[in-house]
């Protein structure tokens, strides 16, 4: 998604490898984000026990999200600060608080600030952090009153999204997140019935709102992918999937930075289809290597800190 956006000059140049628009006019980036939020809801519902309290949940989420984010930010900030002097000249020092909270890119996207010290993480890190805040409440609601939870969620989120009160960055994704949580409780027959209904709903919603269309289509496609998943239940796909899952967050943190740096060395207007394909391969390899390097650096720092401060 970001590769395609970058090499087309954010859609000012012709596409070379991939289209940016899917059926029903759905933007590829929005579709990927929808699947991301659905998977996030499902994975949390699968791994977080019902008896875990909110405080413990927030503590574990913070430990999983912030250390690697701060490390990636420091590395990228250091590079940009030295290699591109003046990159952060317009940022107010107080906006470092947004970086500390993981909300710097979100704040720019939402229009809270014009510029800050954002380097990594992008807007949907902030969005998923807001969803993490809601997770204990949604989990309890689904367990006690699932229909009421869904009714209240839709009654609040759809108007907020349509009115743009959240800059259309959070509210539309709460039902996606909740759908991922709910998916685990659905019987097989229910899933088979729900998939075409959601896709039909996406068709009907197209003239109304693009992101709601994308949310419905994403949920329908997610069910179809889940139904097809047993076909990949083989040793090597499981191994590959497990390895990719280990580095997925690190990939998320570094991939956008890398494609921007790589693309800066090319005249995108004359970049051929072949060279675009080669750049894509280089980009994938660089992202894989950078993600592993970031995780290695985190492990090394943790080991060193544990040796210096064993009581922590």
Model-derived segments and spans:
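Functionally critical transmembrane alpha-helices in membrane proteins and complexes, commonly lining
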Residues: 1-49, 65-73, 248, 292
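Aromatic-anchored segments of alpha-helical transmembrane domains
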Residues: 1-4, 103-107, 153-165, 198-210, ...
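Alpha-helical transmembrane segments of multi-pass integral membrane proteins
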Residues: 202-303
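Interfacial loop-to-helix transition and helix-capping segments at the boundaries
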Residues: 21-33, 111-127, 160-179, 192, ...
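Membrane-interface helix-loop-helix regions
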Residues: 16-24, 39, 65-127, 218-226
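Juxtamembrane transmembrane-helix termini
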Residues: 30-61, 71-88, 258, 262-263, ...
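Structural signal for the C-terminal ends of transmembrane alpha-helices
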Residues: 44-52, 80-82, 137-143, 181-190, ...
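Solvent-exposed interhelical
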Residues: 129-155, 165, 181-197
């Amino acid at each position: 998604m970001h590769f395609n956006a970058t090499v087309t000059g954010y859609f000012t140049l012709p596409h070379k490898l991939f289209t940016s628009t899917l059926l029903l006019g759905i933007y590829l980036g929005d579709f990927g984000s929808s699947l991301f939020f659905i998977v996030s809801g499902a994975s949390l519902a699968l791994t977080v026990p019902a008896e875990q309290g909110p405080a413990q949940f927030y503590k574990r989420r913070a430990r999983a999200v912030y250390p690697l984010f701060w490390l990636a930010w420091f590395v990228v900030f250091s590079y940009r600060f030295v290699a591109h002097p003046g990159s952060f000249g317009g940022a107010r020092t107080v906006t470092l608080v947004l970086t500390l909270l993981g909300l710097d890119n979100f704040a720019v996207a939402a229009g809270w600030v014009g510029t800050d010290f954002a380097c990594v993480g992008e807007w949907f890190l902030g969005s998923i952090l807001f969803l993490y805040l809601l997770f204990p409440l949604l989990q309890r609601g689904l367990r006690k009153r699932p229909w009421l939870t869904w009714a209240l969620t839709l009654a609040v989120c759809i108007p907020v999204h349509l009115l743009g009160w959240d800059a259309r960055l959070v509210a539309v994704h709460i039902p996606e997140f909740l759908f991922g949580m709910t998916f685990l409780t659905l019987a097989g027959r229910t899933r088979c019935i729900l998939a075409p209904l959601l896709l039909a709903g996406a068709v009907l919603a197209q003239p109304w709102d693009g992101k709601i269309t994308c949310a419905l289509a994403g949920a329908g496609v997610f069910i179809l992918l889940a139904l097809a998943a047993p076909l990949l239940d083989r040793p090597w796909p499981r191994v590959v999937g497990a390895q990719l899952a280990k580095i997925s967050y690190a990939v998320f943190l570094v991939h956008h930075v890398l494609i921007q740096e790589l693309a800066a060395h090319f005249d995108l207007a004359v970049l051929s289809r072949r060279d675009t394909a080669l750049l894509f391969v280089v980009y994938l390899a660089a992202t894989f290597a950078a993600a592993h390097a970031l995780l290695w650096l985190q492990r090394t720092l943790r080991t060193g800190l544990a040796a210096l401060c064993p009581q922590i």
